[in-house]
A protein has these predicted regions:
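Alpha-helical transmembrane segments and immediately membrane-proximal extracytoplasmic
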Residues: 1-422
Length: 422
């Protein structure tokens, strides 16, 4: 009888937790889906407007001043994706004012041609919305962290139409080697709801068609492994450039107003020197050309690395994830044929590999390859990801990311041990 009572108590407790997750996931998914849809449409509109009105690029220095003012008014100076990651790790609060700040800042950046993505902004907005939904519902600190993960997953899903990748990425990006499995159902539910909202408003999921897919053989496996090694080197270069400029430029130009104006002018000059439009914005058209048509310039990835690092270092907003797609796709497309791989397929491998190495999220990266390319060539994509992940080092886009285990050894890191002992 006692066993039956224990079973009933456990069942009731589980039902109550499931109800809590549902109460959390539904509003988070709806709000993030709506805001994410508005954000997607806004960025898409200003990107088309800039393409039609090329003179808008000349306004980038002024846009930089407007972004500095916006962040001062909202008191969000210095707040970014690292703060959202820390909100999951330690319960650090995230201001709701971050949502309008990063929304408008990213739209201004894309309107005037800054080289940035949108997923970093999505993680910030989603994390902020999720954390504040948890606060509004008076949830415990632990559950509020789950709400933050759910918001990140929902916003990512609304923008890219990849709900499974979004949920796993939001669960795993904070602590490398640790999966916040209890957050899966609320995160995945929020991601599905947000995805449904974006579909309702006519936003098609991001996917690519691969025209030439080699069979899995010993030869293609070796070629893919070599490409994965090269992508690891590119990932290290991207992260090093990003962090070097983000730390170096503010030291050289401590005044944020001057930094934004001068940095914006430098981005404009670079764009006119190397090609207006090709390296500005997120670059989804260039990514599509590299993956679907097998067309990219050999220096595309280097130009995108520098211009993205410069754009973000001087104070413009957006993200690093889509630029990592661009860098990987163009590098793979240009370098892959030298190894004997089809250019487009090598671009697909490069896209996923550099994303994997830059975010240190192995399983979500493989799932991303499945959702973006429909499962085509998944074994080779997974192989490339594994090699790149293993060799890209303990670096990444997010400095607050904590490595729980070593990449090459099944051992806990010293930093994780210190945190665990606390």
């Amino acid at each position: 009888m006692s066993n039956l009572n224990d079973f009933n108590r456990e069942a009731k407790a589980a039902l109550w937790v499931a109800l809590q997750w549902l109460l959390l996931a539904v509003p988070t998914g709806l709000v993030c889906g709506a805001v994410g849809t508005a954000f997607h449409l806004s960025v898409e509109y200003v990107t088309e407007l800039r393409a039609a009105q090329s003179w808008l690029l000349l306004c980038l220095p002024l846009a930089g001043l407007a972004i500095v003012a916006l962040y001062k008014v909202t008191k969000c100076e210095g707040v970014g994706t690292n703060n959202v990651i820390r909100a999951v790790q330690s319960g650090e609060p995230v201001s709701l004012l971050l949502v309008p700040a990063i929304f408008l800042g990213t739209v201004l950046t894309h309107l005037c041609g800054g080289s940035a993505g949108r997923e970093g902004a999505a993680l910030q907005m989603g994390g902020s919305i999720g954390w504040n939904v948890g606060k509004l519902l008076h949830l415990s600190d632990y559950v509020r962290r789950t709400a933050t993960i759910s918001g990140m997953a929902a916003f990512f899903s609304a923008l890219f139409g990849t709900p499974l990748t979004a949920a796993l990425f939001a669960m795993m990006v904070e602590d490398v080697g640790l999966t916040f499995t209890s957050a899966f159902m609320p995160a995945f539910t929020s991601a599905l709801i947000a995805y449904g909202v974006s579909l309702f408003f006519g936003i098609a999921p991001t996917n690519f068609v691969l025209n030439s897919i080699p069979h899995l053989t010993l030869e293609t496996a070796l070629q893919t492994a070599l490409l994965g090694i090269a992508c690891a080197a590119v990932t290290r270069l991207f992260c090093w450039t990003l962090h070097t400029l983000e730390h170096g430029i503010p030291k050289r130009i401590p005044n944020p107003w001057l930094r934004a104006f001068a940095g914006g002018a430098a981005v404009v000059a670079f764009s006119y020197l190397f090609g207006v439009g090709r390296y500005n914005g997120a670059g989804m058209a260039v990514i599509a050309d590299a993956v679907e048509q097998g067309v990219a310039l050999p220096w595309d990835f280097l130009c995108k690395i520098f211009l993205t690092a410069l754009t973000l270092a001087v104070g413009f907003k957006g993200g690093e994830v889509v630029p990592s797609f661009y860098i990987g796709a163009t590098f793979g497309c240009a370098f892959g044929p030298l190894l004997g791989l089809p250019a487009g397929f090598a671009g697909a491998i490069g896209l996923v590999c550099v994303f994997c190495g830059a975010t240190n999220a192995l399983i979500p990266s493989i799932l991303l390859g499945f959702e973006l390319f429909g499962g085509q060539g998944l074994e080779l994509i997974a192989l490339g990801c594994g090699v790149c992940y293993m060799l890209s080092g303990h670096h990444g886009l997010y400095s607050s990311q904590l490595f729980v285990t070593e990449k090459l050894l099944s051992e806990y890191t010293e930093s994780w041990g210190k945190r665990f002992r606390k």
